[in-house]
A protein has these predicted regions:
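N-terminal basic/disordered segments at the start of proteins
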Residues: 1-40, 44-45
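Extended catalytic cores of very large enzyme megasubunits
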Residues: 3, 18, 66, 70-72, ...
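Pocket-edge structural micro-motifs
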Residues: 22, 61-65, 133, 164
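Conserved oxyanion/phosphate-binding beta-strand-loop segments in alpha/beta enzyme cores
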Residues: 39-75
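Short, conserved beta-strand segments within well-ordered enzyme catalytic domains
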Residues: 60-62, 78, 111, 123
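A gly/ser-rich beta-alpha-beta helix-loop segment of oxidoreductase catalytic cores
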Residues: 68, 75-87, 91, 167-184
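Thiamine diphosphate
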Residues: 95-96
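Active-site cavity-forming subdomains of large catalytic enzyme subunits
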Residues: 99-100, 104-195
């Protein structure tokens, strides 16, 4: 189906493993766009009644079929989770090259489940996921984190999705920063990422 890979990357932070799953074309047609796809995946992967900070509550980064095209405003991705502010579904959009890079990895969505045992930097490249120690990033602002990751990897075009002290401390309205100051800024997705 044009605009989709039909693939979802699922990363289990607890076991530090990842795997790919296929998504049926009918679901891609029915739940179009990053928010629609993310909402479908949230309901599919969530445990009913779970707390937003529970390891069983997924954090989903989803793209639309237009990501990677030359269409204006097509570089948006949706971050979908349960909101720590409301306890209900939350979607937050951000526009950046992170959306394009996610699509270039060959997936339509990235699902994070579980809880990391230590501060962890996920490095996703060419369909491979590496779990790197990120203790050295703890306490840094999002701008400092992005700069430090790029310097550490010696890759100044790598895209970074980061939380700062607010997300680390589970502030219920924390954001996820990316691409030098763009944010997925609604509903506390940064706190979910920090949990």
């Amino acid at each position: 189906m044009f605009g989709y890979h039909g693939k979802i990357l699922v990363v289990d932070l607890t076991s530090e493993t990842s795997h790919w799953i296929d998504i049926e074309k009918e679901h891609l047609r029915q739940y179009i766009g990053g928010v629609g796809l993310g909402a479908y995946l949230l309901f599919k992967f969530s445990v009913p009644g779970s707390d937003p900070f529970d390891p069983s509550s997924p954090l989903i980064f989803a793209t639309s079929p237009l990501v990677g095209t030359r269409l204006t405003t097509s570089s948006k991705f949706a971050v979908v989770s349960k909101s720590p502010l409301t306890g209900f579904i939350n979607d937050s959009l951000s526009s950046s090259f992170c959306a394009t890079e996610l699509k270039k990895c060959g997936c339509d969505a990235l699902i994070l489940i579980g809880r990391a045992k230590r501060p962890t930097l996920l490095f996703v490249q060419n369909g491979r996921v590496d779990f790197l120690d990120a203790k050295y990033l703890t306490g840094l602002t999002t701008a400092e984190t992005e700069k430090t990751v790029k310097e550490t990897l010696n890759d100044y075009v790598v895209r970074v999705l980061a939380i700062g002290p607010a997300g680390e401390n589970l502030v219920h309205y924390a954001t996820i920063s990316n691409d030098g100051g763009r944010h997925a800024g609604r509903g506390g997705a940064g706190a979910v990422m920090g949990s």
